[in-house]
Amino acid sequence: MLRKVRIIFAAVFFFFITLLFLDFTGTIHSWMGWMARIQFIPAVLALNAGVVAALVILTLLLGRVYCSVICPIGVFQDIISWGHGKTKRKNRFRFSYSPAKDWLRYGFLVLFIVSLVAGTGSVAALLAPYSSYGRIASNLFAPVYAAGNNVLAYFAERLDSYAFYSTEVWIKSIPTFIIALLTFAVIFYLSWKNGRTYCNTVCPVGTILGFVSRYSFFKPVIDTEKCRNCGLCGRQCKASCINMKEHEIDYSRCVACMDCLEACNEGAISYRFSLPWKRKAEEGSTNEEKGPAENDGRRAFITAAALVTSAAALKSQEIKRDGGLAPVIGKKAPERGTALTPAGSSGHRHFYQHCTACQLCVSACPYGVLRPSTALDTLMQPEMSYERGYCRPGCTKCSEICPAGAIRKISREEKSSIQIGHAVVNLDMCIVNRDDVQCGNCACHCPAGAISMIPRDPDDKKSRKIPVVDPERCIGCGACENLCPSRPLSAIHVEGHEMHRTI
């Protein structure tokens, strides 16, 4: 029964979290965006103490339920492992106990924490489980989903139905796509062969919650009087944490999947209340060494302190400051001296230190402005570019859904007064000078009224007019760059500000 309940909840979470990355209409984000905000790493980086405390308490009460129900990469592994189990009957019972690889677990955890403190967000993003699944969903699943939608839109249009509409299918970043593909391949292989190996050797969240779950109040317990040593529970344990020879369970690796309860035909395993200190006393009577238990507490304390310290350090480092005339040829991105980050991110320092590169904002951006960065120091973290669209002043979608607090929630009014960059004109590329034609497209579409058209020849008021930008009024939305008819590079482009300003 408990296993079925776990599967139902896991399916619901997995379905809607995946849909957050697939839904290009933005409908699902208004209802299910909270599922992204309760993910562990984004909650830590956002200093969302309520969510972090709730997840720790949940783990202390019920074990690593987060890993088996809420975490999408965990459920994804279960789906792959289940699929392998369905190929042959013997594959259902292919697992066996293996000792914990602590040097790997703690090594990856230290690397993750050090990368957070050092500000190398790209390294941390590679290890963060929610971010890993976000890259897989947005880079591998989303194009397939969009292509399927376009097929339905094609047939619906011929039936005079507009229930579906076509959307553009494109790869936003080749390096991020390759990383997502490699991540998918590694997780698929590990899950297909060994179940939850990734969770218990690589995932930093699994290691952190493993410290807590050692002392959980409810957990699977083996009744040695009922046990017949058949080994079925151990052979179906995808976490490989049941040592049948010693009748012990490594609770730091147990993900509370309840598979062992269903596998046991004798009812020798039950999920029940067990006082941590009482259990430790019982273990101590049969085990002469007390060191490991003491070390567990030290590790848990050190890890928690390191996480809180690193998150607080990131928070303290924040600095708050007010502040068709051409052929249809594809646009190329200009070489920007300073990258553009979304309104609400405050600037580069805050954004890059808090962003987990989960790709949720990239998937949700309705105008194709956000895409993963290819720069080494900000690899996979979103950046703005205006070849396919521009950032509407009335759109605040990315600020509404960011689970890590890298993009703070702002109103439409606030966004209209935030300057993320300013436009720069290259008069040599402007078609007024290059092709000797009239234009003014940039000035017509500037929502801030920051672009004026003045005579090219100051002495001849009838001469063709060229654009001039008022940098004090420009908010960096990119409308001018996107709608400029010059190809392949726009004659006007936006340079970002490392620190956003209020105008």
Language model regions located:
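Non-ligating segments of multi-cofactor redox enzymes
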Residues: M1-H247, S252-R253, D259-I503
